[in-house]
Design a protein with these regions (language model features):
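Alpha-helical transmembrane bundles and membrane-interface segments of multipass inner-membrane proteins
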Residues: 1-162
Length: 162
């Protein structure tokens, strides 16, 4: 797989993420919810000053400094792992993580928060209310899922070879 193709994956995630967030900020009032399906899928416009699942330090300025710093370090680390990896699956996952991290980093730098807008509700499933998320978050979760499955399968293959 060409290295440039993987950078295109990251760029695509960033562009799609920023495009959808711009549409949401421009067309859905903050806090408004638009029903897509009757029971479990909505678009909404929320500002996430925290991290995943709205984890926060309670102070917007501290959040911004900490999360921008941590994300910037994570992007550098993911880029290093991306360059080091020989596996197409790992490289694809790292490209997805990089795109998601950069997409949310842009929001934090530009606005001081991340725009979240996708809201699923799975009644009686683990949580009272599923967190609102965005394309960047989805890309990161997809990549981590891919890495976990790949690691499990790779572990099984290594065990079978021995």
């Amino acid at each position: 797989m060409k290295k440039y193709f993987l950078f295109l994956i990251s760029a695509f995630v960033v562009i799609l993420d920023q495009f959808t967030k711009t549409i949401v900020r421009d067309s859905i009032t903050l806090g408004e919810t638009i029903k897509i399906t009757e029971k479990f899928f909505w678009f909404t416009n929320v500002r996430n000053y925290g991290a995943a699942f709205s984890i926060s330090f309670g102070n917007i300025t501290v959040n911004k400094i900490v999360f921008i710093s941590v994300t910037a370090i994570a992007v550098v680390l993911i880029f290093y792992l991306f360059k080091k990896s020989k596996s197409k699956i790992e490289r694809t996952a790292f490209a997805l993580i990089m795109g998601g991290a950069v997409g949310n980093l842009i929001d934090r730098v530009m606005y001081g928060y991340v725009t979240d807008f996708i809201w699923w509700d799975f009644p009686d499933f683990i949580m009272q209310r599923w967190p609102v998320f965005n394309i960047a978050d989805s890309s990161i979760v997809l990549a981590i899922t891919l890495l976990i499955i790949y690691s499990i399968l790779l572990g099984r293959m290594n065990t079978e070879v021995k």
